[in-house]
Amino acid sequence: MELNKNLIIPFAKQAGLTSFASMSAVKKALSTKKVGHTGTLDLFADGLLVLLTGQLTRLADIISAEKKTYEAWVEFGTETDTLDPEGEPVLTAPLPSYKNLTESIPSFLGKILQRPPEFSAIKINGKRASDRIRSGEKIKIAEREIEIFKIELKGIITDSGLEFTEKDFTNINAELKIRYAHIVVECSKGTYIRSLVRDLARKASSCAYVRALRRTAVGNFKLEDAAGFDLLNNFSAAPENLFLKEKKILDAAAGKKFYKQKEIDFLEIMAKSIIFSPKTAENLKLPYLFLDRKYLNDFYNGKKIKFNWFLNTDEVLENITGLDLENKKTCVFCGDLWIGIIGLNKNCPKYETVIKN
């Protein structure tokens, strides 16, 4: 039986592997090279990658625009050049108190300007910022607007090694010095947790870097539903499971070190795969329209789109705010068949992608 190669695959990336390299297991399982993802994770990070195969790679812009949720372990008192455990220390500062840290958090909620890390995949004149830095260039990355919906402090470890979880915070000594903090962040597309941690620590009169990072959700996709989730370490069990450069092992034949990865079973990849349908779009809360079948040829032939072609236009427009209604990318189905994506706006919807099945 031929495998369906048009799938959505929630996939658990392991720390120490690039997002691109992580896709190799899926490419091998489906015998295809046409696999994309909806948002890169740093090398040291683990967690959810939403992979798209075949024609569904065209959904990347829609899914990547969804909110993201992360868990992070923050180490205070040191800042590295990369703001992660792969970098070299460039700054030290006193540890923040519990009071300073918790009072600093509200400053970062809502829409804020954030300067991305210099060591990042952001392109400057066609070349990654991180590559320019490593080649000795001095660069300056402009601030960009992001939105932080939630920052929760889940646990702390003090300078003396005492551990507290959120249930202990009611009666905690506000002057305790914090070495590590476990936080959960819900944020918009384009947010860098490394930058957030840098700025939060400085606001609390300290400095910090992200010791470990895990993405737990992309929109309604959840990490616990991903292929390979059971292979990830318990993120709450700090610090023994935190990402460390020392976890690299030597490949004597190649003469270099690498991060050992756990194999993901082919059957699990297939079991976790999702076929795209109106029900899938509904469950994932992705915007979608039903095209009246009598306009299918008009749609396929690229005629000017009219709102009366669709059966549920009013319902969709009611759920999109005025601010969002500027080329809001929306999936189009004819019955159960996905036939494309349009840019939805108040005046003239436009074609983004047409899938001729």
Swiss-Prot record:
InterPro entries xrefs: PsdUridine_synth_cat_dom_sf, PsdUridine_synth_N, tRNA_psdUridine_synth_TruB
EC primary class: isomerase
Residue numbers annotated as active site: 42
Tell me where on the tree of life, at the top rank, the source sits. Answer: Bacteria
Catalytic function, reaction form: uridine(55) in tRNA = pseudouridine(55) in tRNA
Q: What does this protein do?
A: Responsible for synthesis of pseudouridine from uracil-55 in the psi GC loop of transfer RNAs.
Family according to the record: Belongs to the pseudouridine synthase TruB family. Type 1 subfamily.
What protein is this chain from?
tRNA pseudouridine synthase B
Q: Which organism is it from?
A: Treponema denticola (strain ATCC 35405 / DSM 14222 / CIP 103919 / JCM 8153 / KCTC 15104)
Q: Species lineage, top-down?
A: Bacteria, Pseudomonadati, Spirochaetota, Spirochaetia, Spirochaetales
